[in-house]
Amino acid sequence: LSAEYGRRISLKGGSFIEPQIELIYSHLNGVDYTGDTDYVGRKMHVRQGAMNSFVSRLGVGFGQETERGTWFLKASLYHEFAGDLSTDYSDGFTPKSTTQRGRDTWVGIQFGGTMKLNDRTSLYGDFEKTFGGDIKTDWRIDAGLRWSF
């Protein structure tokens, strides 16, 4: 579940600047499972707790709009406010618990654009890279064909 607000401010010659804010909530259910161990007749029991994530994004985009399409460059600051994950393990004798703290802050840089093929169809694509957080996205590519009806 997410909510995003941005406002495109037009500049001269088709250029624009676009400040943005976004809030993203997600939930992953917990799960229990059992697996085999190296010990004869022993099973490993694992209980993965549920996880709630709440991320905010504050960004600004710069771009150029033409008759044939749009290109942009966007920089965003992300912060995870929750995202803690707890897991319990047991081989029947020695229980162990671990917790990962999900709170983190990172920066994302995105470059992309849209090219109009006709009034109803366009190609789009963008490249994204993140910096500074515990989990990094070396490069992510999103691309597609958009058809409006």
Regions found by a protein language model. Give the residues of each.
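Membrane translocator/pore-forming domains, dominated by Gram-negative outer-membrane beta-barrels
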Residues: L1-F149
